[in-house]
Amino acid sequence: MKILYDYQAFDMQTHGGVSRYFSELISHLPQNIKTDISVIETNNIYLKALGKEPAGTLYKNFLWHKDSAIKHFIYKLYYNIKNGDFNRLDHTPAINRFESIKQLKEGDFDLLHPTFFDPYFLKFIGNKPFVITVHDMIPELFPQYYACDDIQIIHKNITIPQAAHIITVSQQTKLDLCRVMNIKEEQVSVVYHGANESQYIPNENDKDFEYILYVGERHLYKNFNDFAKSCIPILKRHKELMVICTGKPFTDSERKMLKEYGMENRFKHRFVENDQEMLDLYHYALAFVFPSSYEGFGLPILEAYKAGCPVLLNHASCFPEIAGNAAIYFNMNKHKNNFEEQFETFYHLNGTERKELIKRQEERLKRYSWNKSAKLSAEIYQRFI
């Protein structure tokens, strides 16, 4: 059995949940399954770790090594004509897309697992089956944050109904998918993410202050603004406490908001270079707080569990499904916000109670394995070949 994975997620992300999911899945599949990834060059950190060339290699080695306008012009002309993209002769060639189409036409695979929802492959796949993974239904459930002609929604409505089978990463996502898109339940299987199985050894802590950790994006449904506002009385009460945020730097509007709250010096942004650094941030945090209204799975929960970091979660979406009794829950919605109260309850746990919480997290983490995820995915592939 040979599975073809296309380029989409790896062109979209240098790192991140979707591309990490596919790199872990591919790396953990049973040995009797052959795989191919239709990517020639990439800046995705997970694929580079698997030996793929960095983006720009093809251009660098084209004709002569020195960059120039004439070299760039000939490069675009050559590869676009070579791949029949006559309407885009002045565009930088979509090298990985061309490679995907080439491999689809050659047909040397048994099943395609596209890594996102662009339906470009449908006219090249012939009678070969494809399986697709739905990571969340955020654009459909929060349309107020997306354009009415959002391309992801359009692509999902074309691609998903034509799949031989659909994988979702949580039961919550399956329920949302079936309800919103009128998909039959038997067409969908739930395959959870796995946890990073490498040994984690903390580096020495260089922080001389306690901090709450916020991880990832901060746009609207993530509830960052409400979280920041809820932190005001907490930070005033606990003078030594800070909030560290990863992800993109604070926007102008976020900096303005924090300044209005008098909290601009209590919220710090931190760039994270690698998994070790991220796990260290979790490990030395007082707690990891995830106030989001909706996630497809919530991979940072498992990261925090692995690092031995107490987890506080909004009681929403798939969080109770994934975290079980190994987290402290609060409500942060338009009807109720008791984050401050629940944080103070956590803050005043004694040593024994905190150890019990961490022990529950360690036990919960054992449920999530990339080997198990890959085995279940392989069984799904086999059903449709």
Regions found by a protein language model. Give the residues of each.
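Carbohydrate transferase catalytic cores enriched for Leloir-type hexosyltransferases
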Residues: M1-I385
